[in-house]
Amino acid sequence: MAETDEADVQTKKSKTLIIRHLPRELSRDEKEDLLKYFGASSVRVLSEKGPLKHMAFATFSSETSASKALNRLHQLRILGRTLVVEFAKDQDSASILKDPPVSDRTAAAVAEKEKKEKQQPSVPLMDTSIAPSLGLKFQTNPTLKYLYPPPSSGILTNITHTLLSVPKFYVQVLHLMNKMNLPSPFRPVTAPPPMFEMPSGPLPPPFPPENPPLPEHDESGSEEESEYESEDEEERERMIRLMGLVNQPCKRPLRTKTSSKRKKPKLKDLLFIPKPDSHGPSGPVLQPADVFEQPHALGQKKIEFHISSEVSAILEGPGQNQKLPFADATEDTPDMEVSAQETTEGFGKIYPSAQVPRQEEEQEEDEDIPSEFISRRELERGRLSRDEIKKLSVFKKYEPGEPTCRLYVKNVAKHVEEKDLKFIYGRYIDISSEEERNMFDIVLMKEGRMKGQAFIGLPSERSAQKALKETNGYVLKDKPLVVQFARSAKPKQESADPKKGGRKH
């Protein structure tokens, strides 16, 4: 049996071997060097893809050297792969011998490629980048368009001066006229065409934004809009406003018209006689007697006080019964000073009380607030005026809502943090009171549908009303705050519902 196998091997011997399962880690040259090390005279390595991948044909000088190489290479492990080596069939050996070795073919291909490159003329490549000499090698944006003004006599005169001073520009203009099939300028002067006169006005409007604003809904739909879904509309409004500011032409500042409102005369202007102006025109001087009616001399009037029995029972003596109501009457009118002698003779004269200036009140109020919070001046300086608030669509259909001790703030900028809101709304609590510090809280939404909104909890409705009045419209990080009272579900009074069986005691 072994003799028959050896006989078959002897009959199938050839000079070419087929080597399968070559390691993929080896390159083409390394595979050729490996097989030539075992005595191969020429090697053809097949491609690394397809059904014949990781295979090679090796041709030897004789069948004896091929059989020796087969015995040494068959079942040899290289880089974790076991080689399978066989004698090639006559058809395979004929095709292999017909084709040149791989190394020879690659050299011939390289030589042929170089020959073709030499035959082709070197055409200079046009560099269409912006400024290659300055390092700007990227291409220009094809969507950009120039916005030239319409022709005028001044512009055409300047172009004529440039044509006279730059000969190359003159030649290029002639080339362009020839390319556009325009009439030749080398002839008598033609009649001037009518000039296109553009009315002086602002520049054309800018291109429409990428995200145009959506059409407005009906009033019924706008009333049902949730207060948490206002971020997209506000962002679009902000982008449109910024685009308008960028593309808006420069304008002269309008002169503010002085309002011709008639000043109403005040009581103090009528009481005190103004000093006569030496430079002004002399006129009749009015006396108080000419303006006010003179009090008539009447008899002494009696003042009666009607006191209830409950009040008289509380008072200790009869002397106090007469003094106490008079004191109450004077306390009810702290802004007036009435003398006892004048009350006996008519109503007397009324003088305005000395009012503390507003600046002093603001200074006293700011002194009570710690320096770590915003001052009243900074609030007024950063708050929008009423006219500016009416122009913004963020405040369209704005309503403060029912007063509660919790504020709802929207249109908050992305870069605003809780410490910024604490810096503003911390002035409306008493830092020394632990109870108010615990009741003061800030919830700022930075993600989801409620992004750009915040809730401020204050100790009382009074402080919340004051905070809403002073902070609504305050510009924080380039966006005005829209402050409202937060919606709260108030419990219904049980006495108002007749189905629940009346009031509980």
From Swiss-Prot:
Annotated localization: Nucleus
An annotated GO cellular component: U12-type spliceosomal complex
RRM domain ranges (all copies): 15-90, 405-488
Record Pfam families: RRM_1 (PF00076)
Protein name per its UniProtKB record: RNA-binding region-containing protein 3
Region (Disordered): 96-123, 193-236, 354-374, 486-505
CDD domains on file: RRM1_RBM40_like (cd12238), RRM2_RBM40_like (cd12239)
Organism of derivation: Danio rerio (Zebrafish)
Cited function: Participates in pre-mRNA U12-dependent splicing, performed by the minor spliceosome which removes U12-type introns. U12-type introns comprise less than 1% of all non-coding sequences.
Biased composition (Acidic residues): 221-235, 361-370
